[in-house]
Amino acid sequence: MTESNRLRIAIQKSGRLSTDSQQLLKSCGVKFSINEQRLIAHADNMPIDLLRVRDDDIPGLVMDGVVDLGIIGENVLEEEQIERQTLNKPAEYVKLRQLDFGACRLSLAVPTEFSYADASSLEGLRIATSYPNLLRRFMQQKSINYRDCMLKGSVEVAPRAGLADGICDLVSTGATLEANGLYETEVIYRSMACIIQSTQTQAPSKQALIDRILSRVNGVIRARESKYILLHAPTETLDQIVALLPGAENPTVLPLNDDTNRVAIHAVSTEDLFWDTMEQLTALGASSILVMPIEKMMG
């Protein structure tokens, strides 16, 4: 490929999505090494360039067609799209798929001594946030007037510092809120990481590479969500045992040497096989039960 046909993928330089994004691409067979002093990493085995940038720059780079793909949190993506629509700037993109990491929620939170009934309890109050557009949309939908306090970081300290009456911030476990004397009151947006593509027309060779990468991403995520199950089962309870395997599709049943009363079952399960299920399998006569992770899947 020529330089212009190299696939450019924007990922977060550092932060919660950086490691997961790199691991996903490596699991898809993209070989690269990261030099912390450089913003661009060139793949060794594919015509792919990784641009390591701030997460809030990724949506704009994709929407402006500077890069072809971006891995970004849906919260950042939605925030930037609303901002660009307000400013009449390009705001189009194609979401290729949601990923299986980066889960978080954008929530309202108030001091523990605050009496909160519903979102209308915040009428006329000042709310600190790093996501003013998502907050504004939510409050407008609820017809609630409020004052905003825009902060780029450390939003959770705003009430104690006297800067705001409450906050709207990302929450994972709630431990940070509790440490700052706050409690979560309402979720206004749930987010996962996703892959987005520019709406610009791609050269056939580049689009073929995008499709190839997406196919591998689908396979990696499907493998992560699946388990390979092997067990021995008596033929008299075979149907009951197969019915117990969660999410199993067309398990393979093989005869055992020198044992006409038992068979081997191989199955791919798309759900977790919990201990109670394994105990039920054992009660039906299953033995040698193995549950193994799957590295890759295709087809």
Curated annotation (Swiss-Prot):
One of its GO terms (cellular component) is cytoplasm. Its cofactor is Mg(2+). It comes from the Bacteria. It is found in: Cytoplasm. Its main location: cytoplasm. InterPro entries: ATP-PRT_HisG_long, ATP_PRibTrfase_cat, ATP_PRibTrfase_CS, ATP_PRibTrfase_HisG, HisG_C, N-reg_PII-like_a/b, N-reg_PII/ATP_PRibTrfase_C. SUPFAM superfamilies: GlnB-like, Periplasmic binding protein-like II. Feedback inhibited by histidine. Pathway: Amino-acid biosynthesis; L-histidine biosynthesis; L-histidine from 5-phospho-alpha-D-ribose 1-diphosphate: step 1/9. Gene3D superfamilies: 3.30.70.120, Periplasmic binding protein-like II. One of its GO terms (molecular function) is magnesium ion binding. Keywords: Amino-acid biosynthesis, ATP-binding, Cytoplasm, Glycosyltransferase, Histidine biosynthesis, Magnesium, Metal-binding, Nucleotide-binding, Transferase. GO terms for biological process: L-histidine biosynthetic process. Its EC number is 2.4.2.17. The keyword Cytoplasm applies. Pfam families: HisG, HisG_C. It catalyses: 1-(5-phospho-beta-D-ribosyl)-ATP + diphosphate = 5-phospho-alpha-D-ribose 1-diphosphate + ATP. Catalyzes the condensation of ATP and 5-phosphoribose 1-diphosphate to form N'-(5'-phosphoribosyl)-ATP (PR-ATP). Has a crucial role in the pathway because the rate of histidine biosynthesis seems to be controlled primarily by regulation of HisG enzymatic activity. NCBIfam families: hisG, HisG_C-term. Belongs to the ATP phosphoribosyltransferase family. Long subfamily. PANTHER family: ATP PHOSPHORIBOSYLTRANSFERASE, ATP PHOSPHORIBOSYLTRANSFERASE ATP-PRTASE. This is ATP phosphoribosyltransferase.
